Amino acid sequence: GKKLTSSSVKQLAESFELPIFQPINLKESKFISQLTELKADIFVVVAFRMLPKVVWSLPKFGSINLHASLLPNYRGAAPINWVLINGEKKTGITTFFIDEKIDSGSILLQKEVSIDLNDNAGSLHDKLVYQGAPLIIDTLKGIQSGTLNSRKQNITKSEFEAPKLSAENTKLEWGATLIMLKNKIKGLCPYPGAWSFFENNGIQGRLKILKAETIYEKHSHPLNKILVKGDEIYITNREGYLNCIEIQLPNKKRMSSKTLLNGYKFDSNARVL
């Protein structure tokens, strides 16, 4: 069977002989008692689920969270993915006080990070992680010294949100523009991957596109057709072609179009759906 492995956070905590609590229910009395006994000044939360008030309100100064966007924009579960899907040129990280609502507490500090043309969700995640730890330290120092003032979020319905990724919102919509398709692919790479139904040799299946480039060129091909040109795979669009550089077929590994074509053939009627 598969062996359970501890997270890197747990492994580091164990190396420093720090107490580790892993309750099934965050409201259970034993867990609350353990936290209370710590007499903590503040809790720091990163990449965790919503905490109940009985937990985040325990410390003297409350609890702070690190969020991977410039709040109030992109509140929600998948901010890194959605800034790329929406074609943003910049994003950032925010520390804020936790309150009753998701990602809505008073802002403490923010750090802006530029988004490069070649960034995908994986590379942007790494950029933000690199900036995150120093921002948390600066936030804690500011709270400790009393020099850091928080400010309430100005939340309106017009702010972009970052809902949880699902099969529905990660599917490629082929009526979109080429840049919208490329942005979605970047925003969902390496995980979970932008996907589409396709038909080849009369059989339908699902594929994922992990990397693509846009080619703006007039053509007379039917839309959504899969074309093979040499060792490249193109999908036709009203603006030109989507050059699919890395693809993953069902039950296969992610691979380059050249590698894929070494053992897989698309017929003349192949298309995305």
Question: Each predicted region: which residue ranges?
Answer:
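Short acidic, glycine-rich loop/turn motifs
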Residues: 197-204, 237-239
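One-carbon transfer enzymes
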Residues: 1-190, 195, 240-243, 249, ...
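A general secondary-structure junction signal
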Residues: 97, 198-200, 213
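Low-complexity, glycine/alanine/valine/leucine- and proline-rich hydrophobic stretches
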Residues: 213-242, 251
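A short acidic-to-branched-hydrophobic micro-motif
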Residues: 202-217, 243-246
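Intrinsically disordered, low-complexity regulatory segments enriched
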Residues: 179, 200, 205-207, 265
